[in-house]
Regions:
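Extended, low-hydrophobicity, polar/charged segments
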Residues: 1-186
């Protein structure tokens, strides 16, 4: 996979999609300093490993989940190397068993395709249909990294800016969850 070894600290003159440019301009408007990396499409966390070396930060795994009736939707942010077991999450948020939302639902609700889901896509959730869940270990790293609504670029910024600038600007409250597996299940 191609990853440009040069990083940038501002938006490019031109992007392939409007939503990518909106992501950069949103971060700049709210005073978030970021590092931007360009690369081939990285739709899985495994493909992001090369990008992580260039930006020197772990990329967050973003999952769009829904209840069985598909009436409640959740965006879950977890460390990229963490396994996700739905039973631990369902119990913590008092929900029936959760499943992955479809790509079609992702497009409709957040204007992104599978592999491009990001906390920044919440800017397209004007009706606030998505409940944000953040695994506690996401806050342990100094930096937070995610795609800018397309999976051919990645941005890295301070995790404190996620909490103190990004989420308030998105008008988002969130629930912290603990998804570490008990030792007997590892």
């Amino acid at each position: 996979m191609y990853v440009n070894k040069q990083t940038f600290n501002s938006h490019p003159e031109k992007t392939n999609t409007e939503k990518e440019m909106q992501s950069y301009l949103f971060l700049e408007k709210i005073g978030v300093d970021y590092i931007r990396a360009e690369h081939d499409e990285a739709a899985t966390i495994e493909l992001c490993e090369e990008v992580e070396k260039v930006i020197d930060a772990k990329i967050c795994k973003n999952l769009l989940l829904c209840n069985r009736q598909q009436t409640k939707f959740y965006m879950l942010l977890i460390p990229g190397d963490m396994l996700f077991k739905t039973k631990y999450l369902s119990a913590q948020i008092n929900s029936s068993r959760l499943s992955f939302a479809s790509g079609e639902q992702m497009e409709k609700l957040l204007n992104v395709s599978p592999g491009s889901l990001t906390v920044l896509s919440l800017m397209f959730d004007k009706e606030e249909n998505i409940e944000l869940l953040i695994e506690k270990n996401v806050f342990k790293d100094e930096y937070f990294a995610c795609h800018p609504c397309v999976n051919s670029a990645t941005v890295k910024f301070l995790t404190s800016d996620l909490k103190d600038k990004v989420l308030p600007a998105l008008n988002r409250k969130y629930t912290v969850v603990d998804l570490e597996c008990p030792d007997d299940e590892v």
